[in-house]
Structures are given as C-alpha cells and as structure tokens.
C-alpha cells in the first residue's frame, strides 16, 4: 500500500487496516450510544409527561458557537432535546418522497421527520446554514412529511441568528401549537 500521506510514519499495510477496522468499530459504538440516549430521552419524556424537540441539523450545528445555544434555550422552556440521529433508526418511512433520497444525512432527516410525525409529544426543528445547495431540497421535503401528520414545520437559519429573541418566539409558538393540538 503506497500512501504518500503516511510515508513518514512508516506504517505497515497491516497496521493501517487494523486501525481502519478499529475506527469503524468505534464509530459504530458511537452511533449505538447516540441511539441509546435517544431511547432513554423518550422514556424519560414519557415517564415525566414531557414534550420534546428533535433538533435536526448537520454535525457542526451541535457546536454552541454555531448554534448560539438554541438547545439550551429549548431545554430552558421545559422541553427535552433530541437529535435526529438519536431517533431516525426507529422510523418506518413509508411516506412517498418526491426527491431522490441518496444522501445519508437527508435520509436520516426524512426518517426523523417521519418518526416525529407519529409521536404526539415530539416536534422537529430543522437547523440550516449558508443556504447549502443540497440542503435546500430537504427543507421542502421535511416540511411536507411533517405537515402530512398535522405537525408544524420550523426552520431556523443559523446564519441569520443575531440574537435568540426571534428563535425564542418561534420555539414558544411551536410549544403553543403543541399544547393546542393536545
């Protein structure tokens, strides 16, 4: 295996293959941990009669510097926060998508929207940045999925957030909608 990037480290092919296998195993462990936490959060919500928000976004949206502490704002309103990757595997997406579902993140997002649509105490807030080209397709599709279940779609464009005042109003409106629907 001739990889010039690693030449100075003198790794053998066997060492590189072993490292890749260990990395894949750890990645699977990480994904399983996320799913376990999602199930624990849902159980906690049910046990304590709480409502929750699935905060769906790209991995970099979990960075507090990027998301401006939206997760903290939501929990401060008495709601639980879950991520789309913590619940997407529980979905049985039967909704007919009008887009080609070829990207892992998009597939996870559609599955999460479908799962949220079937839950009475969950809503989904989609975080988006920079008007990302391929992500633009997801906003319409996620909205359609949620609306097919009578749920309100909330999109927060992270790069347009200067302060959390407007976000707070949107989340409170979503919470009021949840209570009204109950």
Task: Pin down the residues of each PLM region.
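An N-terminal assembly and electron-transfer interface module characteristic of large anaerobic redox
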Residues: 1-182
């Amino acid at each position: 295996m001739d990889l010039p990037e690693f030449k100075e480290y003198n790794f053998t092919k066997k060492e590189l293959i072993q490292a890749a296998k260990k990395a894949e195993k750890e990645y699977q462990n990480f994904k399983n941990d996320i799913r376990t936490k999602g199930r624990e959060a849902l159980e906690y919500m049910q046990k304590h009669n709480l409502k929750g928000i699935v905060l769906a976004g790209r991995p970099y949206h979990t960075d507090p510097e990027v998301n401006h502490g939206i997760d903290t704002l939501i929990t401060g309103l008495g709601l639980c926060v879950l991520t789309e990757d913590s619940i997407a595997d529980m979905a049985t997406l039967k909704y007919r998508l009008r887009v080609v579902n070829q990207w892992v993140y998009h597939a996870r997002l559609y599955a999460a929207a479908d799962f949220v649509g079937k839950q009475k105490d969950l809503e989904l807030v989609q975080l988006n940045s920079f008007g990302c080209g391929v992500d633009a397709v997801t906003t319409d599709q996620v909205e359609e999925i949620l609306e097919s279940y009578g749920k309100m779609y909330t999109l927060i464009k992270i790069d347009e957030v200067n302060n959390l005042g407007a976000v707070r109003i949107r989340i409170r409106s979503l919470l009021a909608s949840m209570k009204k629907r109950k």
